[in-house]
């Protein structure tokens, strides 16, 4: 059965219809077993075996099934007793191995045989039937086709007849119309000529008016600028004079007051000297004074420790409140401080009034309260006379003794004051501290005289500067304070009454120490305050008046008993006193009275604002052999460390600012010294020197504020920083070092609060309680951290102070340090392990505190500072390995290290629900908010108790920051999609331009997004098409939707967000922010409508040709069918034509027509026969017999300038103009047969010509085409390069427009000006074939920060493109009119020497006038690139006039040179190859480069390019022998170019410093000579370097007559404007030739000037 089935396969293949059968048969024929390989045969065999097995299985299954059915049908009627059924059953049940024959014949085999036979027959019949049907169908189809063709033939024949009839009528009508139109054309042509003539006249008038207007506008602008400058100068001068007048008036008023006071004081002195009673010394008076006595056993040396700069004191407030009182200049004639200096501070007040100190130190921890002392008429500094002497340098270590100082010997009380002198003992921060007495003057007279000396600013006749009188406050704010003035006057009166003391031998006056007891101690230390004389230096900014201090009376208090101290002087005593941050000086006294009563007049702070003085400490070295007590050096540790950047006062509420600063001089006789005043031995300080056995007696008596005991004194010493006293007190037994006052302040607390590190160290080493808290819970560490004393903090931390101690309000030291804003303290506390998360009772954390003060450094430390792994020290390795550095904040700290604080701490809310972000936003601390926002866990939507977010309470700046927190910055770019790549000048066009970056916020809606996209596109189009470098913000005020180039949001074809298309106005379910995040859109791409849509928007954007002009070009092509685009080479003609053809093609295809573009490049070998074949093959030119085709054909002929237009197109002009069968043209085909052809209406012809203008026979073609001229000085070419380069710059700056002062803008403007100036010069030279279109400049590189790249590119463009074109154009013009033997070709191959000279001169002129001029590179940098430009080394130092008189070779009258460089010998400028010594002088024509007297030598020597080719100069005789009139005309044109006012002068190239943009015609280094009328050019004279002397001589007309006669024809010498004025005057008055040249050349130069002005406008 298998074989039967296999054999049936061919029969089954005939079952399908004929086509399928034929395919199967063909496949069978192709199948050849012989060609199969061995592996393929095996595969086939295995397949066939599998098929056979499958068939056998199927057959067996079918056989069994058929058997059962057959038996059932045949024997089903028998029952069980049927013998046949029993036999069958028994047979089948037999278990024999061999197959047994059936009982009867098997009906299945019969049935299968019948079925196989029937199947075969059926397949054969079906195959035959299918073949018959297919043949029948073919026959029917052929019949139908034949009938259709016959019917169509009949219809076409009828239609042909109808069309012939219609065409005849149309042709007759057209003939009549043509006759009528020809008449009208003639009339219109006549009218057109008239109108054109009128138009030209109007244009001329308009041009003249425009020139006048531009000149007038420029003049008015310059005048306006000058007026503005003068006005600003006048305003400044007026303000200065007004201020000076005010100062002088005030000074005059002060001087008048001084005069009145002086008169009164003199009278008082006279009266006082006569009536003053003798002095007595009561033991105890109300006016007790401090006496310092010293014995001058040997000369004391004053060691000056000076600081003449402002010391940063403990309180920043004091800096504002205290006047600066440092003398301006040392004065030998004035004392350091006069009597009763206003504002002086009682040096002993700190010891005398402990109650004040204690009360003042109990203020708030962070509060500011500076103690003020009430004025007292009884407390004052009393001087017996001034002390004058030498004034050494204050910075010198050992000031010399005065020259007239007597040796320190014991003096008797009777010595007169005139003979009494002593060496200076103590001085403090004053250049005139060490002063000796003038021996010839009475000390009282000196006191009065110095008291009424002038202001410290007024130097006397000796050059010294005197101090202002201390009796009045000269600060500007107190001049109007009558109370302060009256108080000062009273004080002066009282003080001067003390000056009238008795002479030697007179009884002492009461209240003064007796001189008899201290006569052997001539040197007395005194303490005084520097006067306010220097405060008058600046009257303009008075210091602010300090507020009244709480707790201090403003009324005078009763006088207090003073401390009298007699200390051993063997050790240096510190005499500096700080009284309210004033350092009190102690100059010596050399009066016979000897004893200086030290008392201070305390004035109210409210009436005398003061500034801190410049502190300096002079330590007096006492004689050797004397023991110095510990107290003598008590001020060593009194000055706190100056902490930079403190925001809180270091000593806000304590009186430590008035430490005891007393001059101590020991007495040789202690008993005598102590017996001077009873009770002196009871003094604390006297006892400290070793004379008293106990410190317990009362220190004071009669004062209102006595000391309360040792613990109070301990606190006072700690608060004032008195290390010596503190160490003495700590050495006592039984003293409670941890005693706390009523406010709970311990000594350690006071020292830490005021920043006295030495005191803190002493107290801690004495085991003071480091964590002792006051009544508010503040520990010393809290106090030090709050005040910013990081050294104290470091000490306290080292002594295991509780770092996280919380005060009653929950404030920790870290919280207080953050509140103060001292980053050193914060860093120390963090490294010590301070907890950032501790909260106050109000819920504030240290982060809240740092943000509340707006301190960025503190917040950064809190967020990023990591604690070192080991110890408190900060190792270098750790700092380098990720510890946040405040100085490195620019390097994005979050990139280096992640924030240390947790999100919970950042988002922690205080009691009112405010987070740190709320505080920063509400206070406008944008920097702090920005740092908080860097933390990834910040929740900006957290709401406070009033349901407000940080955004709700933020200021405008912070709102903007929060809105842009999660904003996406996605660049928006414009994609210029070209259909097919082309070589039509589009290589330089950028296909992708990024115009801006859109900020997409979370709350941005799709409407806002659409508006933003549209606005960004509109702004971009307006920015790139504007005339100047306007930013995108500047153009937003312009409400016009269309830009100058015609592009707007309507020009968009499609927008894609990432890869998803989107259109303006479309909305998605997600917000724009979510959409961008989900789709991971990295950019938004805008596609503009292009030629494929029948639009030209993308072409406009790519080429920067305005859309309106492109649409006009397209309209011309559609309307006239024959259009030729012509312009200078590189004017993008090919690109424009190709894009127009694409747009036209897609428009026709959209209208249902098929369209084809045929392009042909024309060269010199392109023949008319090739053009005919092109027209015929493209079906543009069809035979007359053939019906017109419906297909649109666009033919582009490129480079038509390479062939003759008249020869190439002559035979096609008529049929192109009249496209119909009525005006056919007969053309001969290649086989010799002629046939009539015509152009049909569906053919468009466009051509391109790279020529500026047509010439000769080509003009015959002009009237048969529509011409589009692409002029370089007119749109679209004029502004194309500017717009293109601006768009390139915007793309380079990622959508931003740089400011005009940016170097990129300057270099781009320079490239633009090079193109314009180059074409302007070439047009003037009459070489239009050398003009360049903007295409060559489109590749200008824009590299920010690398302007030299553009200069290198320009040199390559100059060498590769410009120079060959100019050379060819010059040679072709110079050889046009030569005789045939010297034709153009010959001239180009072998140019004459004259032609070579003209070419070199022209190249040099062009290079300097058009290219190098205006280059923004600095001169030195430009000089490095100048050598890269070819043709710039032509020196052009030759001049010849145009008269024909011959001259001897040596004469150089007509070859006048203008050279600003040093004169060189003429031999250096000769070129051997051009030199012919034997040439006769008769052959030299003076019609040569007469005024080519350029100073190229000088300019190029400065540009380092002449040194390589110094000898490139033509010799006088051979140099410029011009063989034709054209060469002479060229030379004239070159001269006029160099002398033209309208052209840019290269003389400024070497003159300008770094900006070569401005130019002048003055000619410091001119390449060619400028005419004398350039004197009229409005150019700044400051920009021109002065000339050498020989140029000045040549400028004037005072030359020899011979020289003037020779050069009388024309003078193009440049006259520099920067030189003396007589040059111009002489020239204008006497040079008639110059005036004539000016008149003759005015029209041409004005025209050029206007053109230049027109070109320069876009750059402004």
UniProtKB/Swiss-Prot annotation:
The modification Asymmetric dimethylarginine is found at residue 498. Residues 1-26, 203-222, 366-440, 454-478, 499-596, 872-897, 1445-1477, 1617-1660 are annotated as: Disordered. One of its GO terms (cellular component) is cell cortex. The modification Phosphoserine is found at residue 1524. One of its GO terms (molecular function) is protein phosphatase 2A binding. Residues 875-892 have a biased composition (Acidic residues). Its main location: cytoplasm. PROSITE patterns: ANK_REP_REGION, ANK_REPEAT. It is found in: Cytoplasm, Cell cortex; Cell projection, Dendritic spine. Residues 386-396 have a biased composition (Low complexity). Residues 1641-1660 have a biased composition (Basic and acidic residues). SMART domains: ANK. SUPFAM superfamilies: Ankyrin repeat. It comes from the Eukaryota. Transmembrane segments: none annotated. Keywords: ANK repeat, Cell projection, Coiled coil, Cytoplasm, Methylation, Phosphoprotein, Repeat, Synapse. Residues 119-276 form a coiled coil. Signal peptide: none annotated. ANK repeats lie at residues 709-739, 743-772, 776-805, 809-838, 842-871, 912-942. InterPro entries: Ankyrin_rpt (IPR002110), Ankyrin_rpt-contain_sf (IPR036770), Cortactin-Actin_Reg (IPR050719), Cortactin-binding_p2_N (IPR019131). Residues 411-422, 583-593, 1619-1640 have a biased composition (Polar residues). Interacts with CTTN/cortactin SH3 domain. Interacts with STRN, STRN4/zinedin and MOB4/phocein; this interactions mediate the association with the STRIPAK core complex and may regulate dendritic spine distribution of the STRIPAK complex in hippocampal neurons. Activation of glutamate receptors weakens the interaction with STRN and STRN4. Regulates the dendritic spine distribution of CTTN/cortactin in hippocampal neurons, and thus controls dendritic spinogenesis and dendritic spine maintenance. Associates with the striatin-interacting phosphatase and kinase (STRIPAK) core complex to regulate dendritic spine distribution of the STRIPAK complex in hippocampal neurons. This is Cortactin-binding protein 2.
């Amino acid at each position: 059965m298998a074989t039967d089935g296999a054999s049936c396969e061919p029969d089954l293949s005939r079952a399908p219809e004929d086509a399928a059968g034929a395919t199967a048969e063909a496949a069978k024929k192709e199948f050849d077993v012989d060609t199969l390989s061995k592996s393929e045969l095996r595969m086939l065999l295995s397949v066939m075996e599998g098929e056979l097995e499958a068939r056998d299985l199927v057959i067996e299954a079918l056989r069994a099934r058929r058997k059962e059915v057959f038996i059932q049908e045949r024997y089903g009627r028998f029952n069980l007793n049927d013998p046949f059924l029993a036999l069958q059953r028994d047979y089948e049940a037999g278990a024999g191995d061999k197959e047994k024959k059936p009982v009867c014949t098997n009906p299945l085999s019969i049935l299968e045989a019948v079925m196989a036979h029937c199947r075969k027959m059926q397949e054969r019949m079906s195959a035959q039937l299918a073949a018959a049907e297919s043949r029948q169908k073919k026959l029917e189809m052929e019949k139908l086709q034949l009938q259709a063709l016959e019917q169509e033939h009949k219809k076409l024949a009828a239609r042909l007849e109808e069309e012939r009839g219609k065409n005849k009528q149309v042709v007759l009508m057209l003939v009549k119309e043509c006759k009528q139109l020809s008449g009208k054309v003639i009339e219109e042509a006549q009218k057109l000529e008239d109108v054109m003539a009128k138009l030209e006249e109007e244009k001329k008038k308009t041009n003249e008016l425009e020139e006048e207007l531009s000149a007038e506008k420029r003049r008015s602008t310059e005048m306006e600028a000058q007026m503005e400058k003068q006005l600003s100068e006048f305003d400044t001068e007026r303000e200065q004079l007004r201020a000076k007048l005010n100062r002088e008036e005030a000074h005059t008023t002060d001087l008048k007051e001084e005069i009145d006071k002086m008169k009164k004081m003199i009278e008082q002195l006279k009266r006082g000297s006569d009536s003053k009673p003798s002095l007595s010394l009561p033991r105890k008076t109300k006016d007790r004074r401090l006496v310092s006595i010293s014995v001058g056993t040997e000369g004391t040396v004053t060691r000056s420790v000076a600081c003449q700069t402002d010391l940063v004191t403990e309180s920043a407030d004091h800096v504002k409140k205290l006047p600066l009182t440092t003398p301006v200049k040392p004065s030998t004639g004035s004392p350091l401080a006069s009597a009763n200096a206003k504002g002086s501070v009682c040096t002993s007040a700190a010891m005398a009034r402990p109650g004040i100190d204690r009360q003042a130190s109990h203020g708030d921890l962070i509060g500011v309260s500076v103690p003020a002392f009430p004025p007292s008429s009884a407390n004052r500094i009393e001087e017996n006379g001034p002390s004058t002497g030498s004034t050494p340098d204050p910075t010198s270590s050992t000031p010399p003794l005065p020259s007239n100082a007597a040796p320190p010997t014991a003096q008797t009380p009777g010595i007169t004051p005139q003979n009494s002198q002593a060496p200076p003992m103590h001085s403090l921060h004053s250049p005139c501290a060490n002063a000796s007495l003038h021996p010839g003057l009475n000390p009282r007279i000196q006191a009065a005289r110095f008291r009424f000396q002038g202001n410290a600013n007024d130097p006397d006749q000796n050059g010294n500067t005197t101090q202002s009188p201390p009796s009045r406050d000269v600060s500007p704010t107190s001049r109007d304070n009558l109370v302060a003035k009256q108080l000062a006057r009273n004080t002066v009166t009282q003080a001067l009454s003390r000056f009238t003391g008795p002479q030697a031998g007179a009884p002492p006056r009461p209240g003064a120490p007796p001189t008899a007891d201290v006569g052997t101690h001539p040197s007395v230390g005194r303490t005084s305050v520097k006067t306010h004389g220097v405060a008058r230096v600046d009257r303009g900014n008075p210091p602010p008046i300090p507020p009244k201090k709480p707790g201090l009376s403003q009324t005078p208090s009763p006088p207090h008993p003073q401390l009298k101290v007699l200390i051993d002087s063997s050790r240096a005593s510190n005499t500096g006193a700080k009284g309210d941050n004033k350092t009190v000086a102690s100059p010596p006294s050399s009066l016979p009275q000897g004893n200086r009563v030290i008392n201070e007049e305390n004035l109210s702070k409210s009436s005398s604002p003061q500034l801190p003085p410049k502190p300096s400490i002079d330590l007096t070295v006492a004689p050797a052999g004397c023991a110095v007590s510990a107290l003598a050096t008590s001020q060593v540790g009194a000055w706190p460390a100056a902490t930079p950047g403190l925001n809180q006062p270091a000593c806000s509420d304590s009186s430590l600012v008035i430490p005891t600063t007393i001059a101590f001089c020991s007495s040789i006789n202690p008993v005598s010294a102590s017996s001077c005043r009873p009770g002196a031995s009871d003094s604390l300080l006297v006892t400290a020197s070793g004379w008293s056995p106990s410190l317990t007696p009362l220190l004071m008596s009669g004062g209102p504020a006595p000391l309360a005991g040792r613990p109070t004194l301990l606190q006072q010493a700690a608060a004032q920083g008195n290390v010596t006293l503190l160490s003495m007190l700590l050495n006592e037994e039984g003293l409670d070092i941890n005693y706390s006052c009523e406010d709970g302040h311990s000594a350690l607390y006071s020292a830490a609060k005021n920043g006295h590190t030495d005191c803190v160290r002493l107290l801690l080493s004495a085991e003071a309680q480091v964590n002792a808290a006051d009544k508010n819970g503040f520990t010393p560490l809290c106090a030090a951290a709050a005040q910013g004393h990081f050294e104290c903090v470091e000490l306290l931390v080292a002594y295991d102070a509780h770092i996280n101690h919380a005060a009653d309000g929950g404030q920790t030291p870290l919280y207080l340090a953050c509140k103060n804003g001292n980053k050193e303290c914060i860093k120390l506390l963090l490294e010590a392990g301070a907890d950032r998360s501790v909260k106050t009772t109000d819920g504030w954390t240290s982060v809240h505190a740092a943000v509340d003060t707006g301190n960025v450094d503190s917040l950064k430390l809190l967020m990023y500072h990591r604690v070192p792994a080991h110890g408190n020290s900060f190792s270098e390795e750790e700092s380098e390995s990720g510890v946040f550095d405040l100085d490195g904040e620019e390097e994005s700290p979050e990139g280096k290290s992640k924030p240390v604080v947790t999100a919970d701490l950042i988002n922690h809310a205080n009691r009112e629900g405010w987070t740190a972000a709320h505080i920063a936003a509400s206070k406008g601390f944008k920097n702090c908010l920005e740092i908080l926002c860097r933390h990834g866990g910040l929740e900006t939507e957290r709401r406070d108790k009033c349901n407000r977010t940080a955004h709700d309470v933020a200021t405008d700046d912070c709102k903007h920051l929060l809105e842009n927190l999660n904003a996406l910055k996605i660049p928006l770019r414009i994609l210029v999609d070209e259909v097919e790549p082309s070589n039509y000048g589009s290589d330089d066009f950028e296909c992708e331009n990024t115009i801006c970056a859109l900020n997409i916020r979370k709350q941005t809606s799709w409407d806002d997004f659409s508006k933003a996209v549209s606005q960004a596109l509109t702004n971009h189009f307006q920015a790139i098409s504007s005339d100047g470098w306007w930013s995108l913000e500047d153009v937003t005020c312009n409400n016009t939707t269309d830009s100058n180039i015609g592009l707007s949001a309507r020009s968009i074809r499609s927008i894609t967000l990432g890869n998803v298309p989107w259109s303006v106005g479309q909305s998605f379910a997600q917000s724009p922010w979510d959409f961008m995040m989900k789709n991971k859109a990295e950019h938004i791409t805008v596609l503009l409508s292009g030629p494929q849509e029948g639009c030209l928007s993308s072409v406009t954007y790519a080429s920067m040709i305005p859309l309106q002009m492109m649409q006009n070009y397209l309209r011309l092509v559609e309307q006239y069918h024959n259009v030729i685009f012509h312009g200078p080479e590189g004017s993008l003609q090919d690109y424009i034509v190709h894009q127009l053809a694409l747009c036209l093609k897609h428009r026709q295809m959209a209208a249902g027509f098929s369209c084809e573009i045929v392009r042909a490049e024309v060269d010199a070998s392109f023949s008319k026969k090739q053009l005919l074949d092109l027209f015929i093959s493209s079906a543009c030119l069809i035979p007359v017999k053939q019906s017109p085709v419906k297909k649109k054909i666009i033919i582009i002929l490129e480079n038509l300038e390479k062939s003759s237009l008249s020869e190439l197109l002559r035979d096609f002009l008529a049929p192109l103009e009249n496209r119909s069968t009525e005006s056919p043209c007969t053309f001969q085909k290649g086989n010799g047969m002629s046939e009539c052809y015509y152009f049909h209406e569906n053919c468009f012809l466009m051509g391109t010509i790279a020529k500026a203008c047509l010439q000769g026979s080509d003009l015959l073609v002009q009237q048969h085409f529509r011409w589009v001229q692409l002029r370089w000085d007119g749109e679209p070419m004029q502004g194309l390069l500017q717009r293109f380069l601006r768009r390139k710059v915007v793309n380079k700056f990622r959508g931003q427009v740089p400011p005009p002062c940016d170097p990129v803008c300057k270099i781009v403007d320079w490239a633009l000006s090079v193109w314009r100036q180059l074409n302007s010069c070439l047009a003037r030279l009459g070489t239009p074939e050398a003009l360049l279109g903007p295409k060559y400049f489109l590749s200008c590189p824009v590299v920010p920060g690398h302007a030299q790249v553009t200069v290198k590119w320009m040199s390559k463009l100059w060498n590769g493109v410009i120079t060959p074109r100019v050379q060819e154009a010059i040679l072709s013009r110079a050889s046009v009119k030569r005789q045939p033997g010297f034709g153009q070709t010959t001239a180009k191959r072998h140019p004459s020497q004259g032609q070579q000279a003209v070419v070199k001169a022209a190249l040099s002129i062009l290079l300097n006038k058009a290219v190098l001029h205006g280059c923004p590179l600095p001169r030195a940098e430009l000089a490095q690139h100048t050598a890269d430009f070819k043709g710039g080394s032509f020196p052009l130092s030759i001049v010849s006039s145009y008269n024909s008189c011959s001259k001897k070779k040596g004469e150089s009258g007509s070859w006048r040179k203008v050279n600003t460089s040093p004169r060189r010998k003429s031999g250096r400028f000769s070129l051997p190859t051009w030199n012919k010594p034997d040439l006769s002088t008769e052959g030299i024509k003076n019609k040569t480069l007469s005024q080519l007297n350029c100073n190229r030598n000088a300019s190029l020597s400065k540009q380092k390019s002449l040194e390589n080719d110094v000898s490139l100069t033509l010799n006088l005789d051979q140099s410029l022998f011009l063989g034709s009139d054209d060469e002479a005309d060229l030379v004239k044109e070159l001269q006029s170019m160099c002398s033209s006012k309208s052209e840019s002068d290269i003389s400024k190239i070497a003159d300008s410093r770094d900006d070569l943009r401005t130019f002048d015609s003055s000619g410091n280094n001119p390449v060619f000579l400028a005419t004398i009328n350039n004197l009229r050019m409005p150019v700044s004279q400051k920009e021109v370097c002065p000339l050498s002397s020989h140029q000045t001589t040549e400028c004037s007309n005072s030359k020899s007559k011979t020289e003037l006669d020779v050069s009388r024809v024309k003078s193009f010498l440049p006259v520099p404007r920067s030189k003396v004025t007589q040059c111009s005057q002489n020239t204008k008055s006497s040079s008639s030739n110059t005036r004539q040249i000016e008149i003759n050349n005015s029209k041409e130069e004005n025209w050029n000037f206007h053109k230049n002005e027109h070109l320069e406008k876009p750059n402004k």
